[in-house]
């Protein structure tokens, strides 16, 4: 405990640390949060970017909250992510939690600029959100792969799945923004990029001319020849079409797919 106390003293006035739980989209968003906290000099917080896909995932959220407070008692804990969005009251009642922030709000720089003056829950109706944020991430610390958000939310209402209530309705990132994001990462030395979202096979339905995921992949591979490997996160097998099978001949598209069943 003496060593832990000394470590805590040394860590005071250090950058806030981010704990990402759950999906690859959270990894991407965690880097966005990290960049916003660094830019606005937000220090001495532990920010837990949570998951709520299963009951076990929610148990892990509570475990991480308590562990973080025990190990770094001087740091205020901010909870965000799907668990925070779906059940903010549950977590704001935990003594260890200083602030609860919703899934859309966590990507809003204005929220982080005023975070030191905030002490109340900041969670709005996620179903009112119709656009994606347009952040550019330069690197993913400690990771060989880079993650690029192409889509948010889900229009399906599967009886077993709570995620639409954490992420809202499906909304897509415009192709030019995706190309810009990938170009930046490739120019910074990343050989592999993972396209991520909540329901990426629904990509483009809300954009002008409704480009689909497979048209996006072709555009990326044709526009960015320096990109060596492109990988997909989870895909809905019900939305796979002939364009998808034709894409498998592309050597730079990794032939490993996680199917949501």
Language-model regions, residue ranges each:
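Conserved SAM/AdoMet-binding glycine-rich loop
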Residues: 77-81, 86-88, 187-261
């Amino acid at each position: 405990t003496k060593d832990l106390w000394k470590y805590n003293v040394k860590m005071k006035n250090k950058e806030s640390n981010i704990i990402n739980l759950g999906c690859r989209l959270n990894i991407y968003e965690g880097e966005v949060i990290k960049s916003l906290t660094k830019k606005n000099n937000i220090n001495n917080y532990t920010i837990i970017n949570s998951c709520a896909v299963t009951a076990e995932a929610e148990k892990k959220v509570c475990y991480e909250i308590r562990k973080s407070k025990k190990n770094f008692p001087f740091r205020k804990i901010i909870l965000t992510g799907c668990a925070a969005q779906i059940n903010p009251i549950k977590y704001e009642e935990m003594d260890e939690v200083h602030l609860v922030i919703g899934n859309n709000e966590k990507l809003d720089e204005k929220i982080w600029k005023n975070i030191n003056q905030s002490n109340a829950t900041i969670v709005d109706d996620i179903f009112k959100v119709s656009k994606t944020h347009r952040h550019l991430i330069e690197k993913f610390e400690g990771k060989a792969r880079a993650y690029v958000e192409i889509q948010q939310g889900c229009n399906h209402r599967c009886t077993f799945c709570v995620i639409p209530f954490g992420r809202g309705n499906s909304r897509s990132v415009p192709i030019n923004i995706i190309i810009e994001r990938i170009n930046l990462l490739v120019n910074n030395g990343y050989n592999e990029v993972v396209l991520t979202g909540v329901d990426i096979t629904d990509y483009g339905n809300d954009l002008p001319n409704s480009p689909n995921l497979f048209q996006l992949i072709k555009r990326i591979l044709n526009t960015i020849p320096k990109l060596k490997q492109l990988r997909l996160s989870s895909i809905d097998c019900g939305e796979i079409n002939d364009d998808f099978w034709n894409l498998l001949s592309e050597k730079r598209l990794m032939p490993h797919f996680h199917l949501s069943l």
